[in-house]
Amino acid sequence: MTEDELYPTPDEYDEYTMKESTTYTPPKVWKWDQDEENRFSKINRPIAGQTHDKDLPVGEHPLQVYSLATPNGVKVTVMLEELLALGIDEAEYDAWLINIMEGDQFSSGFVGANPNSKIPALVDHSTASPTRVFESGAIVMYLAEKHGQFLPTDQSARAECLSWVFWQMASAPFLGGGFGHFYAYAPDRLEYPINRFTMEVKRQLDVLDRNLADREFICGDDYTIADIAIHPWYGALAMGMLYESGEFLDVGSYKNVQRWTKALQERPAVRRGQRVNRVWGDEAKRLPERHSASDLDS
């Protein structure tokens, strides 16, 4: 069976669902309007590569983080703060601000660290030659393996943990790029995409809620990188911090997610990691760059 036989064409889909076509008629070949100005103009473009020459700064620690305190960025800084809380001095790091609204992610230096031009990126200078790691899930896994923490060694438990990490990586785009965009950022609020992505986000919350019904943490009794990866997205969602959507999604009804979220928010390393590379919100919780533990003590 071919792909064409597996999936209906757009016209066939309209026929199946008894829907009228939308007012937008796509051109035969889409072309990028480089003169278009909107809040995302400096974030999104249809090509990869650098737009300007600029080296990345390098601090005194072996681990160099280039990021912003989005949910994906917070995963990495929370992971590092958790390692430091265990007394692992080798996890000391410098965290440099990458302002994606200004196009910092398209500098030659950042593209060298992450050819995908998305935050966060990590460069480990403790290896024979600098090791670059990009994609937030890959970074937390790299750090867990490097330092032997927050990732089970038992084969079955490890598989469970990594399954949840990859669940988060696969699910969050529906939450952020799907629901978040159409609910909070799109020029017009349209019923169809909001309903479509709302249904998926509520399904994801239910997946988590059912999993946490008889588990203290995502994978059981132990706190792991699965919790570290999932909490910045779904914990923030449960607290009503994402897209001002708490009431709309009825997040309070997911009791197990609420209990888990509150427990993680009590962890000092979580609260510290959430501040790093943060340039919005409460002034007292902002820390554009972090170069030593004392930066977070003020």
What are these regions, as identified by a protein language model?
Residues 39, 278-298:
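Acidic/histidine-enriched, glycine/proline-rich intrinsically disordered or flexible terminal extensions
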Residues 1-195, 199:
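GST-like domain detector, emphasizing the conserved glutathione-binding G-site
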Residues 2-13, 19, 163-266:
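GST-like fold's C-terminal all-alpha helical module
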Residues 154, 176, 241, 274-277:
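Short, flexible helix/strand-to-coil boundary loops that buttress conserved ligand/catalytic motifs
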Residues 138, 256, 269:
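Residue-level recognition of oxygen-bearing side chains
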